């Protein structure tokens, strides 16, 4: 009997040790679950270096604190909207932040931020201020401007993407960053401009100057570039795409006119013989930009001998961006083909 009692006590002790270990492991797992959901790690490169990737549950604060984004991370998000560091990337990717926009995709926000971080981790420069330090010292508002660079092939033309926002904020995460990323799939160099809503045209003029003057350094072609924009950004692209306006706003005659302007959902109606070849699209349910106004302007450009292409999509509202998952999906291919047809 004593031998059986001894075995029972030993077995009970082993069970208690096992239960304690399981409880400790469960506690450790629970304490790290929130962090693991917000950030995941992937291996990069032959040396098995790791990069922590953001997820939908990552916060704006975590993005801003990442060394990859140095002192310009706040420009990833609209500085003129109420975006707090506690907001998740899912929270910030809504029409509550990006007013007037539709078809916003939170997963695209995550992909964009991870793409830029990956480039920075690989030693690539992802942001270029367009103003000198002395200019920023004289006007602090110029600190909130610059070009995010998404990559591209050396020697190929560049495209500057200009988001809308009603000239009250810059909706880049939905209306220019996705475009700048998408264009790299075609080998072209994608830049997205962060501008001052109160001085948007001057900032785009400065951005064009910067890229043209630094083309060799940046390994991009200064010829055959294109200007893209949605809503307010489309007005910017059309205005600086006009040869006369380009010369006036830059004060220079040596910078070539854009080979193409790509416009989305805008009621911009001005036209002249100095306008660039233009591709445009819009939805029939756009309550801000009438498709008939856009069509009428392009018809007038055609009458002046300027090449155009126009698409209107049934049922789409304002600000559909790339149009992924909508009847507009694929328009980007058409716009690229149009741009390429205008290259000299």
Question: Language model features by range: what are they?
Answer:
Residues 43-73, 304-344:
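C-terminal catalytic histidine-bearing segment of alpha/beta-hydrolase fold enzymes
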Residues 276, 290-300:
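Short alpha-helix in the alpha/beta-hydrolase fold that links the catalytic acid
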Residues 172-190:
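Short amphipathic alpha-helix adjacent to the substrate-entry channel of hydrolases
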Residues 206-275:
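Primarily recognizes the serine-hydrolase "nucleophile elbow" in alpha/beta-hydrolase
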Residues 21-144:
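N-terminal targeting or regulatory segments adjacent to alpha/beta-hydrolase or S9 domains
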Residues 280-282, 286:
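Short beta-strand/loop motif that positions the catalytic acidic residue
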């Amino acid at each position: 009997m004593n031998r059986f009692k001894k075995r029972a006590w030993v077995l009970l002790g082993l069970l208690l040790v096992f239960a304690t270990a399981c409880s400790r492991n469960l506690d450790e797992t629970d304490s790290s679950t929130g962090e693991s959901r917000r950030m995941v790690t992937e291996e990069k490169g032959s040396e098995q270096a790791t990069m922590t990737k953001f997820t939908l549950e990552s916060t704006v604060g975590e993005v801003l604190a990442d060394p990859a984004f140095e002192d310009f991370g706040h420009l990833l998000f609209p500085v003129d909207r109420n975006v707090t560091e506690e907001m998740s990337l899912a929270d910030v990717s809504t029409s509550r932040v990006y007013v007037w926009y539709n078809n916003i995709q939170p997963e695209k926000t995550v992909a964009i931020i991870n793409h830029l971080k990956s480039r920075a981790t690989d030693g690539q420069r992802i942001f270029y201020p367009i103003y000198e330090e002395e200019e920023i010292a004289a006007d602090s508002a110029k600190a909130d401007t610059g070009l995010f660079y998404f990559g591209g092939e050396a020697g190929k033309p560049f495209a500057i993407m200009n988001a809308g926002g009603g000239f009250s904020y810059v909706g880049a995460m939905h209306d220019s960053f996705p475009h700048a990323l998408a264009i790299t799939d075609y080998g072209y160099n994608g830049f997205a401009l962060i501008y001052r809503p109160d001085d948007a045209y001057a900032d785009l003029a400065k951005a064009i100057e910067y890229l043209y003057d630094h083309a060799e350094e940046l390994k991009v072609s200064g010829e055959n570039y294109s200007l893209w924009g949605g809503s307010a950004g489309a007005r910017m692209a059309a205005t600086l795409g006009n040869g006369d306006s380009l010369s006036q706003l830059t004060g220079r005659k040596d910078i070539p006119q854009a080979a193409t302007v790509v416009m989305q959902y805008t009621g911009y109606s001005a036209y002249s013989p100095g306008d660039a070849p233009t591709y445009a699209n819009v939805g029939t349910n756009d309550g801000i930009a009438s498709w008939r106004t856009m069509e009428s302007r392009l018809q007038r450009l055609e009458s002046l001998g300027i090449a155009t292409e126009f698409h209107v999509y049934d049922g789409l509202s304002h600000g559909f961006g790339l149009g992924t998952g909508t009847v507009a999906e694929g328009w980007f291919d058409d716009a690229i083909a149009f741009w390429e047809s205008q290259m000299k």
